[in-house]
Amino acid sequence: MRTQWVAKRRGQNNVSQMYYARQGVMTEEMDYVAKRENLPPELIREEVARGRMIIPANINHTNLEPMCIGIASKCKVNANIGASPNSSNLDEEVAKLNLAVKYGADTVMDLSTGGGDLDAIRSAVIKASPVPIGTVPIYQALESVHGNIENLTPDDFLHIIEKHAQQGVDYMTIHAGILIEHLPLVRSRLTGIVSRGGGIIARWMLHHHQQNPLYTHFDEIIEIFKKYDVSFSLGDSLRPGCTHDASDEAQLAELKTLGQLTRRAWEHDVQVMVEGPGHVPMDQIEFNVKKQMEECSEAPFYVLGPLVTDIAPGYDHITSAIGAAMAGWYGTAMLCYVTPKEHLGLPDAEDVRNGLIAYKIAAHAADIARHRPGARDRDDELSKARYNFDWNRQFELSLDPDRAKEYHDETLPADIYKTAEFCSMCGPKFCPMQTKVDADALTELEKFLAQKDKEKVAQ
């Protein structure tokens, strides 16, 4: 779809959506996004220019259907997929991608660390994906030196980053905010550093006693991103891995650096969103969102969860969706899903489905709470269908139509029950939805009550 759109931009030094927005140019991507969001195109351009919104759209991802991430638009959901050395392969990852898109993922991150040819897996995922694809290039950088962190060089990082950009990756997690002086701050934590990428950088700095190479070479990464319109997803290497560690000195020190890096990227018209925690008690979620907006000049916030309790392995799609809904309500722009397998293993297709639906619920609830235009329209339509016992319409409007129909049909599978005025919960005689109060009856009741009021006054 975008082949002709981007053809005229190739060869320019900067092809980012932010660059064009700041030049006053309305790109085709901005116009497309405006239609999807039902927002004025000029608002989209202004928000991208200001940095409060990004349109992750690598010029080499031409089959992309452009979308946006920002506080002015609907709350978005990311799904993670990825092969590991112990599980999964190319075909399985493409299948997970298709499933994620089916169930409403707005973006997908390929977090592959093994399981085959990483370049081939990434290429296949990008080719098959209508949604933006994100990656964490440090994983492949480590794989390229066979896991020997001490052998990694800044050139290794830059080489892999450019390779991902050339392939069409739309945004990349870059762990540039963790500095060598931050490392002593994790001493008081229960769970230390829980970011995979952050852990790699931390071990590199501890071995070499040198500053984070992604920080010292940040301007070179900016130059790569300008050429392909790759968006930064600034990684939170020091995100809390348990509620005990939430909002601590280490997390907030890195956040300050992420704000500085955000503004450095903006100086070159490169798009940025900022990643956030993690594990956060409910009473600290608002603080975390507001603090990010303050430190990062309102760049879009992209959070993993957050999980609001640590005691539910196997159900962390629920513990985190609670926090995600709150974070979205307070202004987070995108939620990274968590599956039931979080902390336990690599998610399979059913885990992807369950995690995504939990997060679509959270994002939608946030949109309603923020009074975004049209956010409740689907709810109202489903409520009408429910009141009218239009079962097929209810299934159709559900976030997971297959699951809704499956549960209904477990006890009432015959087609005749698709028009029945009850389900198996209440049966045919006790369903409260059968209580239909028509307008004439209400008019008669109002007359009766008015007469009673007159009689009381007369007394």
Curated annotation (Swiss-Prot):
Keywords: 4Fe-4S, Iron, Iron-sulfur, Lyase, Metal-binding, S-adenosyl-L-methionine, Thiamine biosynthesis, Zinc. One of its GO terms (cellular component) is cytosol. Zn(2+) binds at H279, H343. It comes from the Bacteria. Gene3D superfamilies: 6.10.250.620, Radical SAM ThiC family, central domain. Belongs to the ThiC family. Catalyzes the synthesis of the hydroxymethylpyrimidine phosphate (HMP-P) moiety of thiamine from aminoimidazole ribotide (AIR) in a radical S-adenosyl-L-methionine (SAM)-dependent reaction. This is Phosphomethylpyrimidine synthase. It comes from Crocosphaera subtropica (strain ATCC 51142 / BH68) (Cyanothece sp. (strain ATCC 51142)). The gene is thiC.
